[in-house]
Amino acid sequence: KRCFSYIDDCLSCLIPMLDQKSLNKQIINIGPDEEFVTINKVAEICSNVTGNNLKPIYKKDRPREVKHATCSADKARKLLNYKTKTDLISGITKTFDYIKGRGVRPFDYNISLEIKNELTPDTWMKKEL
């Protein structure tokens, strides 16, 4: 499970942090800690938003993969008035509309990996689709 952030929600905190010296060197989590979803749910939402009948392709787990990743945005709410304004479905819809308007760019699989060994996931090393 994960918490997914829409970029505009993050920027509403990051931009003011540049000007507030009291926030210098502080660690502040930004994210929608009220919406904790599975990757399967994200795939289902993407399928619905795009109008495609997408079926997930399951790969073996990556070594030491984090199963649940979330944060507490309490400090961001307190210091920066952080509020999640864009829920997951709206964020995916906005992102899909942006990509559809701009056009799909090919994915570059030729990025070299800094560390390549037996623990490197297959999906990082070879083209899957």
Predicted regions: what they are:
Residues C10, L14, I30, V42, ...:
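Non-catalytic, hydrophobic alpha-helical segments
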Residues I7-L11, P16-N29, E34-E35, N52-L54:
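Glycine/proline-rich active-site loop of Rossmann-fold NAD(P)-dependent oxidoreductases
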Residues K75-I111:
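A contiguous, mid-protein "functional segment" used to position or interact
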Residues I7, E35, I39, A69, ...:
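Amphipathic alpha-helical segment in the mid-to-C-terminal domain
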Residues K1-D8, P32-E35, P63, K67:
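Glycine-rich "substrate-gating" loop/helix at the edge of Rossmann-like oxidoreductase active sites
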